Amino acid sequence: MQVILLEKVVNLGNLGDIVKVKDGYGRNFLIPQGKAKRATEANKAEFEARRAELEKQQAEQLAAAQKRGEKLAGFMLQVTQKAGVDGRLFGSVTNGDIAEALTAQGFEVSKSEVRLPEGPLKAIGDYQVHIALHHDVVVEITVSVLGE
């Protein structure tokens, strides 16, 4: 199935690219999420008519993400969790916990934007965590896990 991408899709292409994808990926993910349309002649003509509008929208989203990223860059977040004597936590600190703590601090961050490369944090200490605000804007913050 050939589709026209309506926004940048990681590992696939950029706005306006016509790419060939598996039928299930196109029908079940790209098209319902509004990331692509089938590459028919009518849709190609409609896309070309709306191209400038879509590019402007994408540029605005990037600018907003960069603005949020400047505020977040280098931020140090402290999270407290019950811990044992050896420094291991009872439970763990997940991306949802980090997103909640950042929202409480005044930053709008969803849990899907928080990237934990080694999985949930399970011990006391300082960790570098990536916040992916946009495909092109990834900010690194420090999360300090403290024991109670």
From Swiss-Prot:
<dbReference type="InterPro" id="IPR000244">
    <property type="entry name" value="Ribosomal_bL9"/>
</dbReference>
<dbReference type="GO" id="GO:1990904">
    <property type="term" value="C:ribonucleoprotein complex"/>
</dbReference>
<keyword id="KW-0694">RNA-binding</keyword>
<dbReference type="InterPro" id="IPR036935">
    <property type="entry name" value="Ribosomal_bL9_N_sf"/>
</dbReference>
<keyword id="KW-0687">Ribonucleoprotein</keyword>
<dbReference type="Pfam" id="PF01281">
    <property type="entry name" value="Ribosomal_L9_N"/>
</dbReference>
<protein>
    <recommendedName>
        <fullName>Large ribosomal subunit protein bL9</fullName>
    </recommendedName>
</protein>
<keyword id="KW-0699">rRNA-binding</keyword>
<dbReference type="InterPro" id="IPR009027">
    <property type="entry name" value="Ribosomal_bL9/RNase_H1_N"/>
</dbReference>
<dbReference type="GO" id="GO:0005840">
    <property type="term" value="C:ribosome"/>
</dbReference>
<dbReference type="GO" id="GO:0019843">
    <property type="term" value="F:rRNA binding"/>
</dbReference>
<comment type="similarity">
    <text>Belongs to the bacterial ribosomal protein bL9 family.</text>
</comment>
<dbReference type="GO" id="GO:0006412">
    <property type="term" value="P:translation"/>
</dbReference>
<dbReference type="InterPro" id="IPR020069">
    <property type="entry name" value="Ribosomal_bL9_C"/>
</dbReference>
<keyword id="KW-0689">Ribosomal protein</keyword>
<dbReference type="InterPro" id="IPR036791">
    <property type="entry name" value="Ribosomal_bL9_C_sf"/>
</dbReference>
<dbReference type="InterPro" id="IPR020070">
    <property type="entry name" value="Ribosomal_bL9_N"/>
</dbReference>
<dbReference type="GO" id="GO:0003735">
    <property type="term" value="F:structural constituent of ribosome"/>
</dbReference>
<dbReference type="InterPro" id="IPR020594">
    <property type="entry name" value="Ribosomal_bL9_bac/chp"/>
</dbReference>
<dbReference type="Pfam" id="PF03948">
    <property type="entry name" value="Ribosomal_L9_C"/>
</dbReference>
<comment type="function">
    <text>Binds to the 23S rRNA.</text>
</comment>
